[in-house]
């Protein structure tokens, strides 16, 4: 196996370009999913136990945001103004629709109260158009635990990126 120091400049450049190709392909796939699903974040990870037993911490959720109508009982992912962590909860009430903006009230299945305390200051309901990222259309159990581990232990990100970089550079064609 060749080390980095033993590689010819062209071979090293090819390996670096190969690594860049892998990263850009992943980015293009993410953006493609965003366009198809009409959601800025088409895949999210459940970060808490508020939706148990429907979803467990670490489940990977697939979102769809093409439907403008949301029904009571539907599970949606929304952002709260001023916070950057999406929340996954079930719609328990809906108001308006048609000519007036659709407003939603949500609640976690494992929570005692609705989400009004989680909403932005002065907000009693979610605006379907402005706050909701998408509706859950599918999930894969526990696959998202990698994301949780990476956010709880930041040094793991550096280790994983380093290992991926070494694997790409040392890969033989």
Curated annotation (Swiss-Prot):
Keyword Iron found: no
Membrane topology: Single-pass type II membrane protein
InterPro entries (UniProt xref): LexA/Signal_pep-like_sf, Pept_S26A_signal_pept_1_Ser-AS, Peptidase_S24_S26A/B/C, Peptidase_S26, Peptidase_S26B
Alphabetized CDD domains for the sequence: S26_SPase_I
Record-level Gene Ontology MF annotations: serine-type endopeptidase activity
E.C. numbers: 3.4.21.89
Subunit structure, as described in the record: Component of the signal peptidase complex (SPC) composed of a catalytic subunit SEC11 and three accessory subunits SPC1, SPC2 and SPC3. The complex induces a local thinning of the ER membrane which is used to measure the length of the signal peptide (SP) h-region of protein substrates. This ensures the selectivity of the complex towards h-regions shorter than 18-20 amino acids. SPC associates with the translocon complex.
Domain notes: The C-terminal short (CTS) helix is essential for catalytic activity. It may be accommodated as a transmembrane helix in the thinned membrane environment of the complex, similarly to the signal peptide in the complex substrates.
GO biological process, one term: signal peptide processing
Species of the source: Pyrenophora tritici-repentis (strain Pt-1C-BFP) (Wheat tan spot fungus)
Subcellular localization(s) per the UniProt record: Endoplasmic reticulum membrane
Reactions the enzyme catalyzes: Cleavage of hydrophobic, N-terminal signal or leader sequences from secreted and periplasmic proteins
Transmembrane stretches, start-end: 16-36
Record-given protein name: Signal peptidase complex catalytic subunit sec11
Family in the record: Belongs to the peptidase S26B family.
Cytoplasmic side: 1-15
Annotated keywords: Endoplasmic reticulum, Hydrolase, Membrane, Protease, Signal-anchor, Transmembrane, Transmembrane helix
Parts of the chain on the Lumenal side: 37-173
Enzyme class: hydrolase
Primary role: Catalytic component of the signal peptidase complex (SPC) which catalyzes the cleavage of N-terminal signal sequences from nascent proteins as they are translocated into the lumen of the endoplasmic reticulum. Specifically cleaves N-terminal signal peptides that contain a hydrophobic alpha-helix (h-region) shorter than 18-20 amino acids.
Catalytic residues in the record: 50 (charge relay system), 89 (charge relay system), 115 (charge relay system)
GO cellular component, one term: signal peptidase complex
Region (C-terminal short (CTS) helix) residue spans: 159-170
């Amino acid at each position: 196996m060749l080390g980095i120091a033993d590689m010819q400049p062209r071979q090293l450049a090819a390996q670096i370009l190969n690594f860049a190709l892998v990263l850009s392909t992943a980015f293009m796939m993410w953006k493609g999913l965003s366009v198809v699903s009409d959601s800025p974040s088409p895949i999210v990870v459940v970060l808490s136990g508020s939706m148990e037993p429907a979803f467990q911490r670490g489940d990977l959720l697939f979102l769809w945001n093409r439907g403008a109508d949301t029904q009571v009982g539907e599970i949606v992912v929304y952002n709260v103004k001023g916070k950057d962590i999406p929340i996954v909860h079930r719609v328990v009430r809906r108001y308006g629709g048609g000519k007036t903006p659709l407003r939603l009230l949500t609640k976690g299945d494992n929570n005692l109260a609705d989400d009004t305390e989680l909403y932005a200051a002065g907000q009693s309901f979610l605006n379907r158009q402005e706050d909701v990222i998408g509706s859950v259309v599918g999930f894969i159990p526990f696959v998202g635990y990698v994301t949780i581990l990476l956010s709880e232990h930041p040094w793991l990100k550096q280790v994983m990126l380093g290992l991926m970089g070494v694997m790409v550079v040392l890969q033989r064609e």
